[in-house]
């Protein structure tokens, strides 16, 4: 069964090594029959702790669709890429959002807030104070 995956890759920070490793990953994806491949460069960042004696790394997120049984073979191929420091592959779950329920919930919250505000306003009865108020009450 074809599933949608999202993978985060951490490469060495050197430009030439990064580009070469990224091309290897994309060729591996193509070899294992991945479709709808979308790649996003996140950036180069300092690592919290050294990974394989590297203090900085480049992050890349790649989304793709692939057969589930090809994934293990793809992961074994990733372990052979020299300049790839870390990777993480997740199944991307696509959920449809029911907008009617959201609209109802928002309306209920709005209605409840209006009711609370109107009750607060009704409990505040202004009582006249001062010399003008006694004149009004006497007439």
UniProtKB/Swiss-Prot annotation:
Keyword RNA-binding: yes
Molecular function GO terms recorded: rRNA binding; structural constituent of ribosome
Cellular component annotations (GO), alphabetically ordered: ribonucleoprotein complex; ribosome
Pfam families associated with the record: Ribosomal_S6
GO biological process, one term: translation
Keywords: Ribonucleoprotein, Ribosomal protein, RNA-binding, rRNA-binding
Composition-biased stretches (Polar residues): 130-139
Annotated segments matching region Disordered: 119-139
Stated family: Belongs to the bacterial ribosomal protein bS6 family.
Its biological purpose: Binds together with bS18 to 16S ribosomal RNA.
Name under which the protein is recorded: Small ribosomal subunit protein bS6
Species of the source: Borreliella burgdorferi (strain ZS7)
Gene: rpsF
